[in-house]
Swiss-Prot record:
Superkingdom of origin: Eukaryota
Keyword Cytoplasm: yes
PANTHER family referenced in this protein's UniProt entry, alphabetically: TROPOMODULIN, TROPOMODULIN-4
Sequence similarity: Belongs to the tropomodulin family.
Gene name as annotated: TMOD4
This protein's name: Tropomodulin-4
Organism: Bos taurus
One Pfam family linked to the record: Tropomodulin
Region (Disordered) location: 42-63
Job of this protein: Blocks the elongation and depolymerization of the actin filaments at the pointed end. The Tmod/TM complex contributes to the formation of the short actin protofilament, which in turn defines the geometry of the membrane skeleton.
BP terms from Gene Ontology: actin filament organization; muscle contraction; myofibril assembly; pointed-end actin filament capping
Subunit structure: Binds to the N-terminus of tropomyosin and to actin.
GO MF terms held by the record: actin binding; tropomyosin binding
Length: 345
């Protein structure tokens, strides 16, 4: 133990209350003065709050800040201004600035052929607008008129150069209809291993109960006909991710899995990635756009899974770190090359 620590040990068990009881009123007042927090740099505070008391005299009266400011302002107005050492005579020195006159440019007289003179004399506003666009005079018209005249082979500017250009009328695009999938019927078909059901698409259905999604994953364990399973934007969390992981360990027919845009955390993604290692039929996996960033450890696990699973040729995730991104790109290139060689055979 150093000497400094030994000195600190002396004051560790000191009772502050006992020390304060032994102090006299004068000593307590001095201690209170030392512990006061002052702000000497704040010019908006009165002097009494910017420094400690320098005297023991009692105040002659209460502090009236407004009266003090009025008194200082009145004193400042009553002080006479100092006379200038050199009186101002009003003499002007130097020459005033006179702007030089600019010469008006003379327009050149251009003589055209009689045929062009006659064509321009009888040209309409729409034709003049197209001619100006072809000659590159884009300052005489709007961008819409200019590009319409350049891109179109016919006269399309019927309004003229100086007219008000109307905006294009766009066709209203209706919203996409809701997902018409009946969850109960899909669950029955998956349980009965219906050979006509090869795709389960529950995208954008956000009111599916978690127990029903868990039952669907449980039914997928023994299904041999479903090739694509998509749960995009279904508000699925870690319980659903764990059920998907259990399904991947037993299912041997699923080829595409999409669980993007959900509430799956890094724990749920890690469980899915570990289960992908035990699945040899999955070729496409998409896990991007979760509620929270999974972390560096999950991204490294993704790169490792892609390196160890040559069956995956499509992977949907936006890496934030350069190392896992480069490893995943190399693994995907290798997996696609292996798939191409297998097709040749």
């Amino acid at each position: 133990m150093s000497s400094y620590q030994k000195e600190l040990e002396k004051y560790r068990d000191i009772d502050e209350d006992e020390i304060l009881k032994t102090l006299s009123p004068e000593e307590l007042e001095q201690l209170d003065c030392e512990l006061q927090e002052m702000d000497p740099e704040n010019m908006l505070l009165p002097a009494g709050l910017r420094q400690r008391d320098q005297t023991k005299k009692s105040p002659t009266g209460p502090l009236d800040r407004e009266a003090l400011l009025q008194y200082l302002e009145q004193q400042a107005l009553e002080v006479k201004e100092r006379d200038d050492l050199v009186p101002f005579t009003g003499e002007k020195k130097g020459k005033p600035y006179i702007q030089p006159k600019r010469e008006i440019p003379v327009e050149e007289q251009v003589t055209l052929e009689p045929e062009l003179e006659e064509a321009l004399a009888h040209a309409t506003d729409a034709e003049m607008c197209d001619i100006a666009a072809i000659l590159g005079m884009y300052t005489l018209m709007s961008n819409k008129q200019y590009y319409d005249a350049i891109c179109s082979g016919e006269i399309c500017n019927t309004e003229g150069i100086s007219s008000v250009v109307q905006p294009d009328k766009y066709k209203p695009v209706p919203d996409e209809p809701p997902n018409p999938t009946n969850i109960e019927e899909i669950l029955k078909s998956v349980r009965s291993n219906d050979k006509e059901v090869e795709e389960v698409n529950l995208n954008n259905i956000q009111d599916i109960p978690i127990p029903m999604l868990t039952e669907l994953c449980e039914a997928m364990k023994t299904n041999t006909h479903v090739r694509s399973f998509s749960l995009v934007a279904t508000r699925s969390g870690d319980p659903v991710a764990n059920a998907v992981a259990d399904m991947l360990r037993e299912n041997r027919s699923l080829q595409s899995l999409n669980i993007e845009s959900n509430f799956i955390s890094s724990t749920g993604l890690m469980a899915v990635l570990k289960a992908v290692r035990e699945n040899a039929t999955l070729t496409e996996l998409r896990v991007d756009n979760q509620r929270q960033w999974p972390g560096d450890a999950v991204e490294m696990e993704m790169a490792t899974v892609l390196e160890q699973c040559p069956s995956i040729v499509r992977f949907g995730y936006h890496f934030t770190q350069q190392g896992p991104r480069a490893r995943a790109a190399q693994a995907m290139t290798r997996n696609n090359e292996l798939r191409r060689q297998q097709k040749k055979r």
